[in-house]
């Protein structure tokens, strides 16, 4: 068995039968990624400003040459053997399918750290590939580097020295992006400097303004290298044969001249001698720089282009990372100089998280879904603003605009990268909300066009008000609140316009309510109702903070009335239903998107008496925000019990699903909506037969908050069993596209189980009085909290591992609270010790 890294944590182990679907994204926030496949292969080159599933891109692969003493040398591709199916029109279809690989391979991960172990009886070395990209909470720049770090560890278990070479090869594909384009004038050159040496890939034939223009680099920190800038230009696959023969001869490459090519392949070889019983490491950096990102909503103005090739305004939005680095070589030099520190900071985070006492499935669900932040789902424009698709199609983004009703559910951004969350809030309120209070639930870019979409989603808009409260609390930024408040107030007041969501201003949404299931609900229902109640509570608190007492009182009055009405009229003894009510007056402009019912006298696509999986999503969010109960506490708990009873399936063999399939056969799941007592509309709410992980996590986390721990954990475990590497990719939970944003609701399980809450406004932190080691993060600082029993009391060690934490109060909920005489500042590396007595 090949040894694993001594200090890198591992959450999940995947054997050779569970590798086929693994593709771990390597790259930074807003940079795109190259994925590490389960066999140790590089795939899905999604670095050219768009998704590109299946795109071979640089056709990169790494090869080991090894000679033990006087024995014949062996050469192997540093990948596990190919798995069936092998069939294709011209034989096997994998890249370089005929080359020999390692017979034994396994994958081990705790995102972003991945380890691939290789062994083969014919190879005198055991090999471990260690791959990662820096991920540091509260440091989006350190977590946003366009690099894949690949470290090959060679271990000699024999009794003679082994001469070894690890060689990486990379095709210059600049000009292609996986969907189209043309690579022209590729130019590869060997460089050395800044602690690295290797190949710099550029182009002389692609327009520098094109979205597909950029640079690549393959470098190493190893001192002894040989290279080949370009494989020879000949037919019949002779270039691959020439490369293989050259390396296999003596483990070194000869840089022979080659005729000019548009897509030259370059190779970089690093050499080392591995002593008997010894271990040597060779580190490679794959870096990229494609600065010309285009808007997702191309302007149709004359001269504006289509958004695919034009590199000028109004369609170019650029990439923030490209403002931090001049080209791919600059990325390599700057990363190499900080590599030790970046790895240490990433390790500090991942180790602290993995060593916490959270259940295994919660750690895995929370950590694996952080990969979505680095996928093409998310990006940062040149001005540093953060945006996101809903998810990614195979070749294009899916559902543009930082869609409010989807991004409402996820919690990872706010609690790990608070500055990015604040960027979203500023765009939503200061750019996407018009003077009347209508918030476009999809943002057009550049931000000067943010209101062009011009349609509002009831759940999306209310959720953004709750998120404004959450992010104000986490940051403690009163200036931000005052800046956002006029538009926050307008966004809530928009509910009360004639023909609006709550035109009679009674705290209950009855109007035309577009929502996250892509239709309009007509009449009161629990999903829109709880988002609205949560927004009223959040606005009540924010209004009080800015000195708007009258508006605060209005919000409070409508919250009380709405809460009582929903409990009295929608709760059926088991769960909350929708009371379908066709519109009786003209619908206000901007509320009807057009994807729902066309005949409004008996509207289709309603919930009716159904049991909706996320019917209490607003209450879930209220718990995250610390806003308390929006509805009767016993009704809330009973509803979660009913969702588990009616929507959970121990298998799906008999389940008929007419839409997308994200779970099937022997898999367990929570269905979107069921009709346990009949009454299903002929055309019910869309997706009702489906399964989607973001909704499952929302319900599961809410169960955890309500004390239904075994039920919540069972739901989370059911999700993660479906993403086991053999059935699906553990690092890609799909919904409307790959790497779907909503799935990061999984992070909220960390909050629910630890009871973590932080207010930067009151400088107060709280945890549940639960023994163990807990991980915490507020988006601006992070660390651990250890709670240990001493007789009838509890000893607390609050440690800050990153950022600076300011505190006036610390509490263990329903146990004890400590109030400090002055503000305590706890910096990274410091701890606070407290002795707390139970009541």
Model-derived regions: residue spans:
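Beta-strand-rich N-terminal accessory domains
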Residues: 1-82, 356, 366-369, 374-376
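Acidic/polar, glycine-enriched structural segments that form the non-catalytic walls/loops
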Residues: 1-7, 13-15, 22, 115, ...
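Non-catalytic C-terminal accessory modules of carbohydrate-active enzymes
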Residues: 21, 41-43, 49-129, 136-140, ...
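Aromatic-rich carbohydrate-recognition surfaces in CAZymes
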Residues: 63-67, 73-77, 84-91, 156, ...
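The feature captures the catalytic groove of carbohydrate-active enzymes
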Residues: 141-143, 149-151, 213, 229-232, ...
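Short beta-strand elements of extracellular/lumenal beta-sandwich folds
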Residues: 146-155, 792-800
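Solvent-exposed, conformationally flexible loop/turn segments
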Residues: 276-279, 826-832
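Active-site core of glycosidic bond-cleaving carbohydrate-active enzymes
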Residues: 394-438, 461, 482, 486, ...
């Amino acid at each position: 068995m090949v040894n694993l890294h001594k200090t890198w944590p591992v959450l999940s182990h995947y054997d050779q039968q569970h590798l086929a679907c693994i593709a771990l994204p390597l790259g930074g926030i807003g940079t795109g990624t190259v994925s590490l496949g389960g066999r140790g292969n590089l795939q899905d080159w999604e670095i050219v400003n768009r998704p590109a599933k299946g795109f071979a891109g640089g056709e990169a692969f790494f090869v080991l040459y090894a000679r033990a003493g006087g024995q014949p040398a062996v050469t192997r591709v540093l990948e596990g053997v190919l798995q069936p199916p092998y069939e294709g029109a011209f034989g096997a279809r994998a890249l370089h399918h005929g080359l020999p690989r390692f017979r034994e391979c396994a994958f081990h991960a705790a995102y972003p750290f991945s380890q691939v172990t290789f062994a083969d009886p014919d190879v005198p070395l055991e090999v471990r590939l260690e791959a990662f990209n820096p991920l540091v909470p509260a440091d989006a720049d350190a977590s946003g580097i366009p690099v894949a770090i690949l470290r090959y560890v060679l271990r000699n278990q024999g009794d003679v020295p082994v001469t070894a070479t690890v060689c990486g090869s990379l095709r210059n594909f600049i000009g292609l992006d996986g969907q189209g384009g043309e690579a022209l004038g590729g130019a590869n050159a060997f460089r050395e400097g800044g602690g690295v040496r290797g190949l710099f890939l550029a182009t002389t034939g692609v327009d520098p303004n094109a979205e597909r223009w950029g640079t690549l680099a393959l470098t190493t920190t190893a001192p002894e290298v040989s290279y080949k800038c370009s494989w020879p230009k000949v037919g019949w696959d002779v270039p691959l044969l020439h490369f293989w023969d050259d390396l296999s001869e003596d483990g070194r490459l000869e840089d022979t001249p080659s005729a000019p090519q548009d897509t030259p392949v370059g190779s970089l070889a690093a050499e080392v001698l591995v002593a008997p019983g010894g271990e040597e490491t060779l580190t490679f950096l794959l870096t990229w720089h494609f600065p010309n990102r285009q808007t997702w909503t191309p302007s149709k103005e004359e001269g504006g282009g289509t958004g695919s090739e034009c590199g000028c305004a109004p369609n170019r939005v650029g990439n923030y990372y490209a403002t931090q680095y001049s080209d791919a070589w600059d990325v390599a030099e700057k990363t190499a100089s900080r590599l030790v520190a970046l790895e240490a900071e990433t390790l500090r985070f991942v180790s602290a998280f993995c060593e916490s006492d959270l259940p295994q499935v919660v750690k895995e669900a929370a950590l694996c879904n952080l990969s979505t932040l680095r996928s093409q789902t998310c990006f940062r424009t040149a001005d540093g603003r953060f945006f996101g698709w809903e998810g990614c199609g195979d070749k294009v983004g899916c559902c543009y605009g930082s869609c409010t009703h989807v991004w409402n559910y996820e919690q990872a951004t706010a609690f790990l990268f608070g500055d990015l969350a604040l960027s979203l809030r500023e765009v939503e309120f200061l750019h996407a909300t018009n003077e009347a209070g209508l918030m476009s639930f999809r943002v057009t870019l550049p931000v000067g066009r943010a209101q062009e979409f011009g349609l509002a989603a009831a759940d999306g808009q209310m959720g953004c008000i709750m998120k404004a409260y959450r992010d104000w609390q986490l940051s403690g930024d009163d200036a931000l609140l005052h800046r956002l408040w006029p538009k926050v107030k307008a966004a809530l007041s928009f509910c009360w316009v004639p023909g609006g969501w709550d035109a009679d201003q009674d705290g209950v949404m009855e109007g035309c309510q577009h929502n996250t299931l892509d239709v309009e609900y007509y009449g009161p229902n629990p999903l829109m109702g709880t988002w609205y109640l949560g927004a009223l509570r959040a606005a009540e608190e924010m209004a009080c903070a800015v000195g708007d007492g009258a508006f605060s009182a209005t919000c409070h009055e409508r919250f009380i009335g709405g809460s009582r009405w929903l409990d009295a009229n929608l709760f059926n003894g088991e769960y909350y239903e929708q009371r379908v009510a066709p519109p009786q007056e003209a619908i206000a402009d901007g509320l009807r998107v057009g994807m729902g019912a066309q005949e409004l006298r008996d509207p289709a696509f309603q919930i009716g008496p159904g049991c909706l999986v996320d019917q209490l999503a607003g209450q879930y969010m209220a718990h995250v925000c610390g806003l308390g109960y929006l509805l009767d506490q016993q009704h809330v708990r009973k509803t979660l019990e009913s969702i588990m009873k009616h929507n959970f399936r121990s298998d799906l063999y008999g389940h008929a699903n007419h839409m997308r399939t994200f779970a099937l056969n022997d898999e367990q799941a929570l269905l979107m909506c069921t009709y346990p007592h009949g009454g299903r509309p002929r055309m019910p709410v869309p997706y009702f037969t489906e399964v989607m992980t973001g909704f499952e996590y929302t319900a599961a986390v809410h169960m955890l908050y309500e004390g239904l721990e075994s039920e919540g954990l069972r739901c989370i475990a059911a999700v993660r069993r479906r993403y086991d590497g053999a059935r699906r990719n553990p690092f890609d939970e799909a919904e409307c596209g790959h790497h779907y944003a909503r799935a990061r609701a999984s992070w909220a399980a960390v909050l629910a189980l630890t009871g973590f809450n932080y207010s930067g406004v009151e400088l107060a932190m709280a945890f549940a009085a639960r023994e163990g080691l807990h991980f915490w993060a507020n988006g601006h600082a992070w660390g651990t909290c250890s709670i240990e029993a001493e007789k009838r009391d509890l000893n607390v060690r609050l440690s800050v591992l990153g950022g600076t934490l300011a505190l006036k109060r610390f509490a263990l909920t329903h146990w004890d609270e400590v109030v400090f005489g002055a503000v305590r500042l706890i910096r990274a590396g410091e701890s606070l010790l407290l002795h707390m007595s139970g009541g």
